[in-house]
């Protein structure tokens, strides 16, 4: 799967998980935590959606604010998981 496709899917996950009333194009994705005020409950919902959408398992030690800090960090994580 290509990185740009992964990013678009992540944007859809963010919109759904955070109940955002915006289009995917409006997500800048450089600082997701501050851009959307993601809390721990939101993060768990996002992680679960990522696991289901991309058919990956996120290990407990991978769960962190750094992982969902930006679109690039999430994309890189998913691409790494899919390449294993």
Describe each region flagged by the PLM.
Residues 2-38, 48, 52-84:
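Phosphopantetheine-dependent thiolation modules in NRPS/PKS and related acyl-activating systems
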Residues 44:
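Conserved catalytic core of two-component sensor histidine kinases
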